[in-house]
């Protein structure tokens, strides 16, 4: 009996560890070195081959986890250039090393200076240049290649980002609207790593949705790994705030905040982390409308969340933002029984289409302005 108990205890521990093991990787540190330049040949004035370079190339469908699995270790070196010889006065260039990384990776050096932002498919950057081949300027000695450490920081690229406190129902919504299968349970912090799902429409249009782990108050100051999660909404085009209509309490040690206070709290967290996020189009979903008393609360709170500025005086000072969100729409839903899910999908699409049209017109105006500047006052008028 004791042996059985020990076996069950061991099994439960291993399962717990497996659940919290970080399978999602969004940062990676690599040591990169360009190839050494080949030596020249003084007798004949020969020039050594240049050392190879280390490139990063953005590819869709990749993850940093796959990048790590494809490397023997986290050190990458390009080949050295060939020495000059009688048979080959100009030494051959060393072979380059190309590392494929996910789209959305930002590359930083050890001083946290941005080297490149690989936000498009096939975007490329050199992270370690090759050494110069030996020539008269170097006394015919090949120069060493660039040797340094780079940090890769992945920021997910999705159309929609789900934002909310723990246990608000974000994962349930993601499962209802998309093909994703996130873990769902009736306790906070079910989602411990970002999840991405795709909403597919009948006309083959698709929208990607990122479900981020629940935030806590103080996320802007990196409490609860807030920075690790908040950074992923920087590249999203539309923010969807998910709030429990009955409010939320993280633990018995924390105060219970009602629905309106939670909206202000989320507003404040984003403002303190990056005020520009408040300029993004946003939608508010008030969840758990299937429960008794939800409609009465919604009737009272809808006018207030429709105009957050009007209720700032009643908002607790620690939650009061300087700039308030202006929601494009407010939808009461029940993610559990899929109530109004079709309306949510339609609303997300309409908002993104409107945003794309606005961007198209802005780009068109920029093109016209550039043409006006090139043509000048003598050319034909462009309307």
Swiss-Prot record:
Pfam families: GTP1_OBG (PF01018), MMR_HSR1 (PF01926). Residues 158-353 form the OBG-type G domain. GO terms for cellular component: mitochondrion; nucleolus. Residues 22-157 form the Obg domain. GTP binds at residues 164-171, 211-215, 287-290. Belongs to the TRAFAC class OBG-HflX-like GTPase superfamily. OBG GTPase family. PANTHER family: DEVELOPMENTALLY REGULATED GTP-BINDING PROTEIN-RELATED, GTP-BINDING PROTEIN 10. May be involved in the ribosome maturation process. This is GTP-binding protein 10 homolog. It comes from Drosophila melanogaster. The lineage of its organism: Eukaryota, Metazoa, Ecdysozoa, Arthropoda, Hexapoda.
